[in-house]
Amino acid sequence: MKLKKITFVLIVAIFAVSTAFAFQFSPFVEQTFSPTGADSTKSYTIVNDSDESIAIEMSTLIRDQDSKGNELNKSAANYFSIVPSKVIVKPQSTQIIRVQYKGPRTVTSELSFRLRAEQIDYSLGRQEQNQSMFNFLYVYTASVYVAPSKIVESVVVKQVTPGVNEDGEQVLNVTLANTGNVHQILTEAELTLLDNNGNRVILSGDKLPGIDGSNVLARKIITKTIPWPKELPYPETGSASYKAQITYSK
């Protein structure tokens, strides 16, 4: 499976107390750990290029998905060792963070996590007259995976059903199943639909909102709702049936 660029989520929270400073966190690609050996440990770098010390707290989260593909998280503290997990980074300096996987040594299906670098309030030595109304604190959230020894890549359409959304609009519910054992990013996805009357349509790009470019974690089944394709007659009764296939760039 080719290496894909990481998506870092930058969350800016506003707090009243003092002025805080942004930091840089790298690498900028998703990291895949091995359950054992040298690749069970990875290094990250925090760069503080400001003129003030900043405080950073590191943590890991289990990454899961609900039936709609929304991300769910809970602590993964038992899976990783992070050294240091809390650090004061001095002005114009860097700090190396070492993250080691400590979870199960036998992994048959990819494990998905988030690595979180969170700036926490740090006001030691600042004078009250230099304080401002807002404190901008930054959080970087990175993708982390623990790979199985053998990789199987496969996402299939489990079911498609017509429906009506809360606004009364005709929609198509598409249920996708990742039958492989690693996450799949549905880049350049194409969905081919065929109804029992022989009508056929191929959907891609902006006709697949929530599907094209989405990440389906290993062994997960998710349902996405998209607008009903105008090229396909909407069924007047519940007797319609559909065949569907999805392709994407791996």
Question: What is the role of each PLM region?
Answer:
Residues 102-151, 231-250:
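Terminal connector regions
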Residues 17-19:
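N-terminal signal peptide c-region/cleavage motif recognized by signal peptidases
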Residues 1-10:
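Bacterial N-terminal signal peptides that target proteins for export
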Residues 51-74, 181-200:
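Short acidic, flexible loop segments centered on an aromatic residue
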Residues 75-105, 200-233:
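Intrinsically disordered, low-complexity Pro/Gly/Ser/Thr-rich segments with frequent PxxP/GP/PP motifs
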Residues 22-50, 84-86, 154-179:
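Beta-sheet-dominated interaction scaffolds and their linkers
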Residues 121-186, 197:
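A charged, solvent-exposed segment within the mature domains of Sec-exported extracytoplasmic proteins
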Residues 46, 101, 117, 176-178, ...:
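Hydrophobic beta-strand positions in extracellular immunoglobulin-like domains
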